[in-house]
């Protein structure tokens, strides 16, 4: 087999017939598969052992040679080589075709490559290939030119002959008529009879004329056709062609079918064609030029590669190895077989029949029909259904051809190469494991034993519990008690990976140290549930076991859950205590007035705990406690004379003192009620300022405290805790009157339906808000529902409002708001009508969610594909470019504060330039990491904007550099070289995709074209760079605005400042203007509200503007849903969308006009041309949608496994494309290590040299007196048992 580690590039090309024969181990001549009685393969058939190898290891077909000792011998009786049966997976055969056939991919693909090469329309090509027309393949122009005069004379003579014959025939008939008439007259016949005779004679003469005219016409047509005959002409008229061939067959040759195409290709002059096409491109216009460009691309592909155009026509076809198209026996003695065998059988049958017909010398029409059927059989084998009706099997099911085996989710690429199943894995239901540490998980004993079986067996033998592996296996299967002890030992320090599907981001797989647990469920730490998006309502998780030392090291260092506290999308902690833990900590840290023991003082926490245990102190009572090592909270006013480090009597509650025990010793004392918000600030602070080990310990302590105090708090809900406000009735009644008044105005015709709707919606929204306010006032402070919502443990006020206040307004399935509210709440219960309108929205919500999930998954897949080769390739690209970002702004209240976009725009990046204050003090150096601390310092110093490095301005050729990317949000440190930031970006954008709403937004009113697309569809529209629906125009020039309005239409006219021709933008009457009549607009200014077309932004304002536009617009959608994603992730994707340039004029560069060139290659070519003094190429930057950009990648393997597999492979094979295996996907397909992280080439050949000290320790210097001669024996000369020496352990002979 091929070793994947010995090559760095993979090329695909066109195979010629000789290549196919060279790969083959023999010709398949018969359509038989296996003998139904003996079940052995038939000789020369599709499963023949002579061709493909033996079906049993080391055994030939006839049984003469059995056993491995005959390895490599070819049996002289049956001709089968004695070898392993697995060669049947790799040995190929071939079928020698009796007539050539074309390859359907090259003839039928869009565009038809064969058609482009030969300059034929696909339908004409089809006529030739399927025997409906003849094609002229050769014309002897010289000889024809020489002989033309004599041939002209011949044809003239023949014409004369025909005319002469006609005249003689007519004359003879006329004479006969006269004789007949004379005879009739003599007989005295009536005039009627004479007229009949005359008419009959006239008819006959007309027929003679007609016949001779047809003859002359035919001669004329044949002669004209012959005079103008040239190569590649088609002739669909069989009779005309026959005559041509009969008369002038020596001057030309023509034929039908693939043979005609093959002849054309043999004599095709690529160089001359390329030159002619270049000339057409230079001088041509419009359609001709475009077609010439497309044709040149195909011609060029053959010129620049070793591919021969003849590869598109096949003389023999390969037969793939039989184990890849197996035939298996089912229970009932019937056979199930791969569809390919049926398709191959049809080809062989037709081929054999054609051979027989040719041998018999059958008439041409029969032979041609058989050839056509052979062509169709080969088409069906390669790509069934591409032309005409697909070949069907039993039950009218189309058979799966070779193309279908590659395509789609079930095809070879995605099913077997990118989605392999993994050994050493298991899955089970998860339950919560609150007793675990953050880095642990509970693994069921049986599952652990099965997973670690080989390790346990080896250890059993090492410890002499078992004699050999076989007996160790028996022990494990019988689950002896010693096995469990060994299992405990084996699993220590051996991490396992847990994965929950769907794995939407990198935190969907994490490593844990296993702890053995009883039962069959996996125990999961409650804090990692958020990362896995797991809950315990029956979710299942998979366990994988990293085997090699490297894999274990990676799992421990990179994937251990305690090292994955931060979320890669925004760099903030993901392991947040939630629900029960929050209510517990809220209960612990709240204070109660008048509580038991309030106002007392204690000498230490221990004393306060003692008082609490004795029942003399309430947990929430405000007391004074003396602390010895208190770090005071920020803003604490210290008593006079106190210095830090001394003991201090501090006013707090016992609960808060206990809460602070869970935090690191030097963390400032938290002296306040801790709800969800406060807790998130604390955890964020811990993650930013403390090492991971301490953060994990603190989180575990918070979890313990949270659960413990939640249990002791006894928080419950009864129906009596849901209190409906007493004022609700009067509030509703007052608004009912207002609503009735509006309805009355509408019925009198004073207001329109639209106005009525809007007013009613306003009235009832206000009513709902009033009821909400009354309800909140009505809740007692220590009411449990109030505490749950107030602490952020569960639910929100909107949900409480629906239970205790009123449901309010709801929407119908179209998304319009129904102007009649639901006045009841769930505590009171809904009326039938109310219930009915409420179900609308609920049902739509469920349908939406289902659709969203699939859409979001597909978006993630496209994002991963476009960005998978963005890897950090170098430390610093050395650029000084960057993006200017705002870090502080003045709010409406006049106070300067941090800008809202700091989190996603400036945080976790690298400074591009040095920042100085107004007085010239250096506040931060270029290259510094921008963290929370630095941002706060800069804002305080009065800095408003800073310039930061960005992926968009990175100068790296491949991938991007560490400095431009900045901090890795998942680790909080500068990103490492080798990090696959493209995939992390795709996951960060795709993972929250499911949360984005599907609906297009309606503000009441009827649906209309200018509804703003929002949510997921908007994100897709942006990343696919589509022109948005209801596009808003942007001004192409700077100038003055005039708004021109008529009854029906409205348009904006811009008069440019430079006096050029004015530009008109027609817009709808409904659109909202962003400019007024007479305003001055700048270039690129948006004229009406709505979404602008990114392609226009690129054309008018340039690449930097479109980058900013795309990043801002995508962020807009995510922010509106409350999802935080860092800008850098979106920038990585946008960078990939702008990677290519369309070549406008190739100059002297080695580029084709109109081709999409990679920006780096385009610049390199131009540099080369300019250095040689030539004319460089000109191009314009191209914005490609993510699907198009994925397919335009330089890696054909990656593109083929993404979409349109056959199209990509056709194109790649024709151009002889090489895949340099730089991305991740290509390497996964080939089974190589991915070039990210430690798989980067720079780490491949690392040698670790021991230091001198290490060498000295390893080889101690001996004196003679120190040598101990006791390697075998005890020095006393007494013999020792061989078992005590570790010789041949595990290989003891079993002499029983």
UniProtKB/Swiss-Prot annotation:
GO terms for cellular component: DNA-directed RNA polymerase complex. Gene3D superfamilies: 1.10.132.30, 1.10.150.390, 1.10.1790.20, 1.10.40.90, 2.40.40.20, 2.40.50.100, RNA polymerase II, clamp domain, RNA polymerase Rpb1, domain 3. SMART domains: RPOLA_N (SM00663). Zn(2+) 1 binds at residues 60, 62, 75, 78. Binds 1 Mg(2+) ion per subunit. Binds 2 Zn(2+) ions per subunit. Zn(2+) 2 binds at residues 877, 954, 961, 964. One of its GO terms (biological process) is DNA-templated transcription. Its cofactor is Mg(2+); Zn(2+). It catalyses: RNA(n) + a ribonucleoside 5'-triphosphate = RNA(n+1) + diphosphate. Keywords: DNA-directed RNA polymerase, Magnesium, Metal-binding, Nucleotidyltransferase, Transcription, Transferase, Zinc. Mg(2+) binds at residues 535, 537, 539. Belongs to the RNA polymerase beta' chain family. This is DNA-directed RNA polymerase subunit beta'. It comes from Beutenbergia cavernae (strain ATCC BAA-8 / DSM 12333 / CCUG 43141 / JCM 11478 / NBRC 16432 / NCIMB 13614 / HKI 0122). The gene is rpoC.
């Amino acid at each position: 087999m091929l070793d994947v580690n010995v090559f760095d590039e993979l090329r695909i090309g066109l195979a010629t017939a000789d290549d196919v024969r060279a790969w083959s181990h023999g010709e398949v001549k018969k359509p038989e598969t296996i003998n139904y009685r003996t079940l052995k393969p038939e000789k020369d058939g599709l499963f023949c052992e002579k061709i493909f190898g033996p079906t049993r290891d080391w055994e030939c077909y006839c049984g003469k040679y059995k056993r491995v000792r005959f390895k490599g011998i070819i049996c002289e009786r049956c001709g089968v080589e004695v070898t392993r049966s697995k060669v049947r997976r790799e040995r190929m055969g071939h079928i020698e075709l009796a007539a050539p056939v074309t390859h359907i991919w090259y003839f039928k693909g869009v565009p038809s490559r064969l058609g482009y090469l030969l300059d034929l329309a696909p339908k004409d090509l089809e006529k030739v290939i399927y025997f409906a027309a003849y094609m002229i393949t050769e014309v002897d122009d010289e000889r024809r030119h020489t002989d033309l005069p004599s041939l002209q004379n011949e044809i003239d003579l023949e014409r004369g002959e025909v005319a002469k014959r006609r005249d003689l025939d007519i004359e003879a008939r006329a004479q006969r008529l006269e004789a007949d008439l004379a005879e009739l007259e003599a007989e005295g016949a009536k005039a009627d009879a004479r007229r009949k005779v005359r008419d009959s004679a006239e008819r006959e003469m007309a027929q003679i004329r007609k016949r001779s005219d047809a003859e002359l016409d035919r001669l004329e047509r044949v002669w004209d056709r012959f005079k103008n005959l040239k190569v590649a002409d088609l002739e669909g008229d069989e009779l005309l062609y026959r005559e041509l061939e009969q008369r002038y067959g020596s001057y030309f040759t023509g034929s039908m079918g693939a043979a005609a195409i093959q002849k054309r290709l043999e004599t095709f002059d690529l160089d001359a064609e390329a030159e002619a096409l270049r000339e057409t491109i230079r001088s041509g216009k419009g359609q001709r030029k475009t077609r010439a460009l497309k044709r040149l691309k195909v011609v060029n592909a053959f010129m620049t590669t070793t591919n021969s155009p003849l590869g598109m026509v096949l003389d023999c076809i390969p037969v793939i190895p039989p184990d890849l198209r197996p035939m298996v026996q089912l229970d009932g003695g019937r056979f199930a077989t791969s569809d390919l065998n049926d398709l191959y059988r049809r080809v062989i049958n037709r081929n054999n029949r054609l051979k027989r017909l040719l041998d018999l010398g059958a008439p041409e029409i029969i032979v041609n029909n058989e050839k056509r059927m052979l062509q169709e059989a080969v088409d069906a084998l390669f790509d069934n259904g591409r032309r005409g009706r697909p070949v069907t099997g039993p039950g009218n099911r189309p058979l799966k051809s070779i193309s279908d085996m590659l395509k789609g989710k079930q095809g070879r690429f995605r099913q077997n190469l990118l989605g392999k199943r993994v050994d050493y894995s298991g899955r089970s239901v998860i339950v919560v494991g609150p007793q675990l540490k953050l880095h642990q998980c509970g693994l069921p004993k049986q599952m652990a034993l099965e997973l670690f079986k080989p390790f346990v067996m080896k250890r059993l033998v090492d410890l002499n519990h078992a004699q050999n592996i076989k007996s160790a296996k028996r022990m494990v299967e019988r689950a002896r008690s010693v096995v469990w002890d060994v299992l405990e030992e084996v699993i220590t320090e051996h991490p396992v990976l847990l994965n929950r599907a769907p794995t939407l981001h990198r935190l969907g797989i994490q490593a844990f140290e296993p702890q053995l647990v009883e039962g069959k469920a996996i125990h999961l730490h409650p804090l990692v549930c958020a990362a896995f998006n797991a809950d315990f309502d029956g979710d299942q998780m998979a366990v994988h076991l990293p085997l090699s030392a490297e894999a274990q090291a990676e799992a421990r260092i990179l994937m251990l859950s305690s090292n994955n506290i931060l979320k890669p999308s925004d760099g903030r902690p993901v392991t947040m205590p939630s629900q029960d833990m929050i209510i517990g900590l809220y209960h612990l840290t709240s204070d109660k007035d008048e509580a038991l023991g309030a106002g007392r003082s204690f000498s230490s926490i221990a004393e306060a705990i003692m008082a609490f245990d004795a029942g003399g102190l309430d947990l929430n009572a405000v007391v004074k406690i003396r602390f010895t090592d208190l770090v005071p909270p920020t803003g604490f006013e210290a008593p006079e004379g106190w210095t830090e480090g001394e003991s201090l009597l501090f006013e707090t509650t016992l609960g808060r003192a206990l809460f602070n025990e869970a935090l690191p010793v030097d963390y400032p004392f938290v002296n306040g009620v801790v709800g969800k918000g406060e807790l998130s600030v604390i955890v964020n602070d811990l993650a930013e300022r403390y090492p991971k080990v301490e953060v994990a310990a603190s989180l575990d302590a918070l979890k313990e405290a949270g659960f413990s105090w939640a249990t002791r708090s006894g928080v419950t809900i009864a129906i009596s805790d849901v209190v409906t406000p007493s004022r609700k009735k009067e509030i509703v009644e007052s608004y009912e009157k207002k609503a009735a008044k509006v309805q009355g105005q509408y019925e009198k015709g004073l207001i329109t339906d639209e106005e009525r709707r809007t007013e009613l919606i306003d009235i009832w929204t206000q009513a709902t808000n009033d009821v909400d306010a009354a309800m909140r006032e009505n809740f007692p402070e220590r009411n449990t529902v109030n505490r749950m919502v107030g602490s952020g443990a569960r639910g929100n006020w909107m949900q409480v409002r629906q239970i205790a206040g009123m449901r309010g307004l709801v929407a119908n399935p179209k998304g319009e708001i129904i102007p009649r509210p639901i006045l009841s709440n769930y505590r009171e219960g809904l009326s039938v009508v109310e219930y009915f309108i409420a179900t609308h929205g609920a049902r739509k919500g469920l349908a939406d969610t289902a659709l969203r999930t699939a859409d979001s998954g597909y978006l993630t897949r496209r994002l991963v594909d476009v960005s998978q080769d963005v890897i950090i390739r170098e430390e610093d690209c050395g650029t000084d470019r960057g993006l200017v970002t705002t870090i502080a702004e003045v709010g409406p209240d006049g106070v300067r504060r941090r800008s809202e976009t700091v989190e996603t725009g400036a945080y976790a990046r690298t400074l591009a330039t040095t920042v100085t204050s107004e007085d010239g003090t250096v506040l931060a150096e270029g290259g510094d990491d921008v963290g929370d601390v630095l941002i706060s310092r800069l804002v305080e110093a009065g800095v408003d904007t800073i310039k930061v490095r960005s992926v968009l301005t990175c100068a790296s050729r491949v991938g991007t550099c560490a400095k431009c990317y900045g901090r890795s949000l998942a680790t909080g440190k500068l990103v490492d070289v080798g990090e696959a930031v493209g995939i992390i970006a795709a996951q960060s954008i795709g993972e929250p995709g499911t949360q984005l709403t599907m609906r297009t937004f309606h503000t009441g009113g009827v649906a209309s074209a200018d509804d703003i697309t929002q949510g997921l569809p908007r994100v897709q529209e942006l990343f696919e760079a589509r022109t948005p629906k209801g596009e808003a125009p942007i001004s192409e020039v700077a100038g003055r605005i005039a708004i021109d309005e008529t009854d029906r239409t409205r348009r904006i006219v811009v008069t440019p400042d430079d006096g050029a021709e004015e530009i008109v933008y027609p817009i709808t009457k409904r659109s909202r203007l962003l400019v007024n009549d007479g305003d001055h607009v700048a270039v690129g200014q948006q004229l009406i509200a709505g979404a602008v077309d990114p392609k226009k932004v690129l054309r008018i304002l340039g690449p930097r503007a479109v980058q900013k536009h795309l990043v801002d617009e995508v962020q807009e959608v995510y922010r509106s849903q409350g999802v935080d994603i860092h800008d850098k992730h979106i920038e990585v994707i946008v960078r990939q969308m702008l990677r290519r340039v369309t070549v406008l004029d190739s100059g002297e560069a080695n580029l084709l006009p109109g081709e999409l060139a990679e920006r780096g290659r385009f610049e390199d070519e131009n540099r080369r041309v300019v250095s040689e003094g030539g004319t460089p190429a000109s191009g314009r930057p191209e914005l490609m949608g993510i699907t198009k950009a994925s397919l335009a990648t330089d890696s054909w393997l990656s593109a083929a496994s993404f979409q349109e597999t056959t199209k990509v492979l056709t194109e790649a094979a024709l151009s002889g494309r090489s895949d340099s295996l730089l991305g991740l996907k290509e390497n996964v397909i080939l089974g190589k290590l991915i070039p990210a992280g430690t798989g980067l080439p720079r780490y491949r050949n690392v040698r670790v040299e021991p230091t001198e000290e290490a060498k000295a320790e390893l080889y101690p210097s001996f004196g003679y007196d120190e040598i101990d001669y006791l390697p075998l024996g005890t020095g006393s000369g007494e013999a020792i048992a061989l078992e005590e020496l570790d010789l041949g352990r595990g290989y003891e002979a079993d002499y029983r």
